[in-house]
Amino acid sequence: MSGEIKSFFYEFQLTLDKVLDYAVTAFPNNEIVYWPPGGSRISVTFSSLADRVRRIAAALLDLDLKPGRAWELGSKVAVLEWNTLRYLDLYYAVPSIGAALFTVNAMLAPKEIIYTMGVARPEVFIVNIDYFEPLLKPILDNVKSIRAVVYMSDRGRVPGQDYGVKMIPYEDLLKHEPLREFPEIDERTPATLLFTSGTTGPPKGGYHTHRGLVLHTLSTALAVKNPPINASPDDDAMVLVPMYHVHAWGWPWSTMLGGHRKIVYPGRFDWGHILRVIHEEGITFSAGVPTILYNLLTHPDSPKYDLSRLKFIVGGAALPEGLLKAAQARGMTVISGYGLTETAPVLTIAYLRPEHRDLPAERKNEIYLRTGVNIPLVQLRVVDEQDRDVPRDGKTIGEIVVRSPWLFKEYIGDPEKTRGAWRNGWFHTGDAAVWYPDGYVKIADRLKDVIKSGGEWIPSLRLEDLISTHPGVNLVAVVGVPHEKWGERPVAIIVPKPGYEGRLTENDIKNYLMQFVEKGEIPKWWIPDKVIFVKELPLTSTGKIDKKVLRDQYKDALSK
């Protein structure tokens, strides 16, 4: 009898095509807008998107792409593109046929792009030739796995030469007959292939499965419904996290699952254009690294626009208190989130619990500035070097370790790094944090960025947070610099606000920090030994301040 029952049972697989299927069934007429700089506004419904996805999926199958299996990559499709409607097509079409979507980081140096593509070995390369055609020949010369190039353009361009491989215009994919049924795929099949940003060495690759990404989509869509974000289908969303960066934090999937009535993709990152589109489309919900929020607030056109309806989640780096208050002065709602490339990425969001909702504004800000509390289906601890939980006192620093369904199983071709990350059944993030009695955490630093002075730790993020509140400070980074006596000492590198260039002094900053010493918030020995003023700070390919460059640049700053 049990055999008969089993024969009728359908083992439902959590695959990304199911997210699209639900969105189309529940919200067929919701709108996706693609509005690139200098281009015209293009609008499609969720139903129209599904038709595009099915046509592209069928066309890709005709290129003889092979599906993966449980924990085993199939054919890889590399994409080099900005935040466009075409990229959204591919976020669904490529994984839904069992292939792996490899999101090439557009901000890497050409050598790093070639390196990651050499490791990934994609069979099909889909590329925006308006911006990236100069990379085509060096990539094809070095990455011999590529047998077809699909080229995209907003300007009607065609490739400028014969590249020796099959060249297909993206529009030809859309002319294909739509795929009637997506193939059955094991939910453990890798859906995406990502690389870390490589701030401590060459970028490292790993994959995320359909199951992990579907559960991540459900969890994040649920978590953002909490106050103060209160995300709902009435929110018009803009995808500002680059789509080449950790799935754009899952927004191409979660915003559709969440039924947002309008989802806007602004193309390449032109901040004057983006501000205008936020205004004209009535955007109320977005997210990005602190640099993105900083650009929205400081662009010369920014004062022309009302940002008071915009709810914004900051992740990828710590939210400085000064940036939070600058955004609040414009009426914005801003909170923190946290995650990694290896974690798909979201692990925590600093939402408010019921007991927080009547707190004074300053107390709420303390919560928004924390890294947050784990979202559904994430288990999180903060541990010492012996993997023991640190006290939940908001003071003791340890490392964040996690479990969830959406983690890298391994780093491709790097068993040593895999062993270092997975220990005792927990994924070690490399992030130092404190743990509060209520379960919220706050990142103190990357373990590699903690300043080790005289055998004690100085968290650079805490100093940056305090310095950022000075009225003359635009951006700040604090790094550890070699010191003959103490091992390392902190040095602050500051970009002054307009009007403060040449006026702001080292003593101004040190005296400003003394007030926090006198209040007992930091010890005196944390005050930086040196303050350096610059016009700009170096950024990584994902828009974070590049402390590796700063440590190297200022390694002799305290030499006698």
Question: At which residue positions do the language-model features occur?
Answer:
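Conserved AMP-binding/adenylation subdomain of ANL enzymes
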Residues: V214-D236, Y244-T284, H299
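Conserved AMP-binding/adenylate-forming
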Residues: S40-S43, A59-K111, V239-L240, W457, ...
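Structural core segment of the AMP-binding/adenylate-forming
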Residues: S96-D172, P498-Y500
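Conserved pre-ATP/AMP-binding loop-to-beta segment of ANL
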Residues: P28-E31, M167-I168, K175-F195, P202, ...
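AMP-binding/adenylate-forming catalytic domain of the ANL superfamily
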Residues: M152, E518-K544
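Conserved AMP-binding A3 loop
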Residues: S43-S47, A191-L218
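AMP-binding/adenylate-forming catalytic core of the ANL superfamily
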Residues: L108, I114-Y115, F125-V127, S286, ...
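Gly/Ser/Thr-rich phosphate-binding loop
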Residues: I168-E171, L257, E280-G288, L297-E366, ...
